[in-house]
Amino acid sequence: MKSSSELFERRRSRNRYQIRLKSAGRLRLSVFRSNKHMYAQIIDDAEGRTLVSASTVDKELRGNLTKGGDKAAAAEVGKLLAERAKAAGYTEVVFDRGGYKYHGRVQALADAAREAGLSF
């Protein structure tokens, strides 16, 4: 029987492969979720550079949040990331859930980013 970390890695690589096939050179919004914090970044895979990032450990958000690992915090990260991306001139991205299920904090981040102006 495979461990949960092995299954997670399989899901992550399968997701990344599909994104590579379907992205057509668009930027990638990558999500990382830990038990305490939420991180998101927009990556240009052609150049291998992170263009915009936001997380619950940013100084802008740290004072406003009571917890860094709940849905409200994830929504704030999505909103901040979308604002920074729009200021830098990026609006079209491909969502990379990174092997996590599209539920809970990951979904809250994605919905907030969409509402703030990112399209994916």
From Swiss-Prot:
Task: State the UniProt keywords alphabetically.
Answer: Ribonucleoprotein, Ribosomal protein, RNA-binding, rRNA-binding
Domain of life per record: Bacteria
Cited SUPFAM superfamilies = Translational machinery components (SSF53137)
* Entry's Gene Ontology molecular function annotations: 5S rRNA binding; structural constituent of ribosome
Q: Which GO terms describe its cellular component?
A: cytosolic large ribosomal subunit
Q: Does the keyword Ribosomal protein apply?
A: yes
Presence of the UniProt keyword Ribonucleoprotein in the record: yes
Q: Biological process GO annotation list?
A: translation
Q: What InterPro entries does the record point to?
A: Ribosomal_uL18_bac-type, Ribosomal_uL18_bac/euk
To which protein family does this belong?
Belongs to the universal ribosomal protein uL18 family.
Subunit-structure text: Part of the 50S ribosomal subunit; part of the 5S rRNA/L5/L18/L25 subcomplex. Contacts the 5S and 23S rRNAs.
Function, as annotated, reads:
This is one of the proteins that bind and probably mediate the attachment of the 5S RNA into the large ribosomal subunit, where it forms part of the central protuberance.
| PANTHER family registered for this protein in UniProt | 39S RIBOSOMAL PROTEIN L18, MITOCHONDRIAL, LARGE RIBOSOMAL SUBUNIT PROTEIN UL18M
Q: What is this protein called?
A: Large ribosomal subunit protein uL18
The record lists the organism as: Rhodospirillum rubrum (strain ATCC 11170 / ATH 1.1.1 / DSM 467 / LMG 4362 / NCIMB 8255 / S1)
